[in-house]
Amino acid sequence: MAALIPENLSREQCLYLAKLAEQAERYEEMVQFMDKLVLNSTPAGELTVEERNLLSVAYKNVIGSLRAAWRIVSSIEQKEESRKNEEHVHLVKEYRGKVENELSQVCAGILKLLESNLVPSATTSESKVFYLKMKGDYYRYLAEFKIGDERKQAAEDTMNSYKAAQEIALTDLPPTHPIRLGLALNFSVFYFEILNSSDKACSMAKQAFEEAIAELDTLGEESYKDSTLIMQLLRDNLTLWTSDAQDQLDES
């Protein structure tokens, strides 16, 4: 369990301790240090690119392990249901509820920071897209496990956040920019996994990939690795999604 952190830490100390926690793979504490840094620095000031990336890494690791846990528990729940083992099903459902509460808390934490501090503090197109994309990501993580009206609301909030990010990205960031590419990647995943709209997912991923390929020679050395990695992920998803569609055609 992450410990309470000292009250009187400076911005530099928070940054150093967040990096230390990252090295030690203590991501819950990394989140605490970055939360404190954000609350002390924004919305009056803006995070540096390094701080912004550390915040993203901290939350991504915490939410990543919870999402993985949720998928495993849900899969076990289905197996127990197929075995008609009522006692086990009851225990697994309760445990899944516990994981879902933690997921909700983590998402609520970062979404509050984004809404109150980070989006209002953003002055550049790059940082605006970064934070709006992040907002979309965490609403999407809620949509992965919520049901009924809560799922509908989370999906709506995801769509609004990604669309707001996309409007700025398409106007102000080049097609090869890693943040614009990352947005296209995650937005297309949202269409595929949450909205079950494989056509829209494929067309969005394909367009982003092709536009980036056309301008590949303009890529600076500093973002070449990031951009080409995301382009590879876009292509992997396209291959997977189109083969899925083909499988369904073969079956029907």
Swiss-Prot record:
InterPro entries documented for this protein: 14-3-3, 14-3-3_CS, 14-3-3_dom_sf, 14-3-3_domain
GO BP of this protein: protein localization; signal transduction
Pfam hit, one: 14-3-3
SUPFAM superfamilies listed in its UniProt record: 14-3-3 protein
Entry's Gene Ontology cellular component terms: cytoplasm
Family as reported in the entry's similarity comment: Belongs to the 14-3-3 family.
Subunit structure comment from the entry: Homodimer.
Protein name: 14-3-3 protein 10
Gene source species: Solanum lycopersicum
Phylogenetic classification of the source organism: Eukaryota, Viridiplantae, Streptophyta, Embryophyta, Tracheophyta
